[in-house]
Amino acid sequence: MALGLFRVCLVVVTAIINHPLLFPRENTTVPENEEEIIRQMQAHQEKLQLEQLRLEEEMARLAADKEAEKEALERVAEEGQQQNESRTAWDLWSTLCMILFLVIEVWRQDHQDAPSPECLGSDEDELPDLEGAPLRGLTLPNRATLDHFYERCIRGATADAARTREFVEGFVDDLLEALRSLCSRDSDMEVEDFIGVDSMYENWQVNKPLLCDLFVPFMPPEPYHFHPELWCSSRSVPLDRQGYGQIKVVRADEDTLGCICGKTKLGEDMLCLLHGRNNVVHHGSKAADPLCAPNSPYLDTMRVMKWFQTALTRAWHRIEHKYEFDLAFGQLDTPGSLKIRFRSGKFMPFNLIPVIQCDDSDLYFVSHLAREPGGGTRASSTDWLLSFAVYERHFLRVTSKALPEGACHLSCLQIASFLLSKQSRLTGPSGLGSYHLKTALLHLLLARRPADWKAEQLDARLHELLCFLEKSLLEKKLQHFFIGNRKVPQAMGLPEAVRRAEPLNLFRPFVLQRSLYRKTVDSFYEMLKNAPALISEYSLHIPSDHASLPPKTVIL
């Protein structure tokens, strides 16, 4: 109780002592001048206002920066959206173009499929309307004039073609037999029977003297054999090598292409009868053949022609005592060109061309031709021209059986070839040859119906043939009839690699040689211009110099 009272008294005393009225604080100072206080407060207020303005400016700048950044982001987003839209549009356009190209390619593949043999030449609508082509306003003689010209000039000039063929074939048989007798079966080439090709064997020869073209296939002696390599078997081939191929000479013990031991791994208990374990195959070894190019296993065309000319010379010297005429090389720039020269002064030319068969087909690799279809020069001496002459003869023979009796297709070709040869003698040779005429005719035969080739339609078909040539010249495009042409009936037996190859343009040299192209076009229209007068002149009178003068000969 006493302790509690003491605590209360202590609190009261403490409160009295600490009351400010009784004991004021010693450190408390009252400002003497209120104006100084007000001035300081105003200065402080101004500082606060300045700071507030600075903060407001800073906030405004930050807001402007944010706005600019926002606008930049929006601009970038807009540009990105536009780029995406343009990229999407471009991708869409590219996709549409690709689809369009695929559709065109599929259509082209279907469009080029070969018709059945019984429908040969029934697609008349696939050709453009060539009969309305102007030919620069030049006109051809009517059918009556053409018929009279054909009977007087062409049929009469080629009446002895059969006798010429018979005589040349008999002599060549004897010559090749003598050649075989001089060759050794163990070391020399094996020469096979000749094959007649071109105009004399397709019945459209028109120029005199009548000229026989004969292929002479040959094979190497054992143990060698030929391995042909087509240009279309390679993915990338230069344009100047299209239509050519190479012929590799291989030994039987080096050729593993047809042997299973070169493709599979034999077990230890299996032995190849052709290639023993001790018989190591040396790929790419140098072929021991004098007809190959230096340091190459491929046949050289120049060496083959030199060998062939030497062999023919030896064979002729062996049998020359049996004949009362001389044999000479006709043209120095055309290997294989021969000429029989009688004592009366008359002569009979013919071509013997060494060839190599391409596998088991009717394609032949030709060393040289007097008139190369491509119109160009070969890239190297190991390039052999691929000839379709046997297929062309077979196609004309098969097609002729489906045409009406007395069809005018060969007459058209003969008249056109006659006009071209006369024009070449007037203005010199051009880039247009008889092979181009025949190629154009083959295309028309495949496109026209058989009924369109009746004899009374000679003038219409001749006009169409010349219009087709005109169109091809203007476009600088004349496709090879067999290479890449899927319209050709499969019954022809054309190799599938050639059938599916890229089409070969026979007029490709015109793209690179402008002067040759201009000369060819001018010569073509000059030929059309001279055709009426030339046909009329030869219909009334056949000049004695129907043939050109014989070139210089070299006696064997």
From Swiss-Prot:
- From what superkingdom does this record's organism come? Eukaryota
Starting at the broadest rank, the lineage of the source organism is: Eukaryota, Metazoa, Chordata, Craniata, Vertebrata
Functionally, this protein is described as follows:
Enhances Ca(2+)-mediated inhibition of inositol 1,4,5-triphosphate receptor (ITPR) Ca(2+) release.
Where are the annotated glycans? N27, N84
Q: Which GO terms describe its cellular component?
A: membrane; nuclear outer membrane; plasma membrane
Per the record, the GO terms for biological process are: extrinsic apoptotic signaling pathway via death domain receptors; negative regulation of extrinsic apoptotic signaling pathway via death domain receptors
* Keywords assigned by UniProt, alphabetized: Cell membrane, Coiled coil, Glycoprotein, Membrane, Nucleus, Signal, Transmembrane, Transmembrane helix
What transmembrane ranges does the database entry give?
89-107
| Species | Bos taurus
Q: Which residues form a coiled coil?
A: 32-87
Q: Where in the cell is it found?
A: Cell membrane; Nucleus outer membrane
Q: Which residues lie on this side of the membrane: Cytoplasmic?
A: 108-556
Q: What is this protein called?
A: Inositol 1,4,5-trisphosphate receptor-interacting protein
Q: Which family does it belong to?
A: Belongs to the ITPRIP family.
Query: According to its record, how does it sit in the membrane?
Result: Single-pass type I membrane protein
Assembly:
Interacts with ITPR.
Parts of the chain on the Extracellular side: 16-88
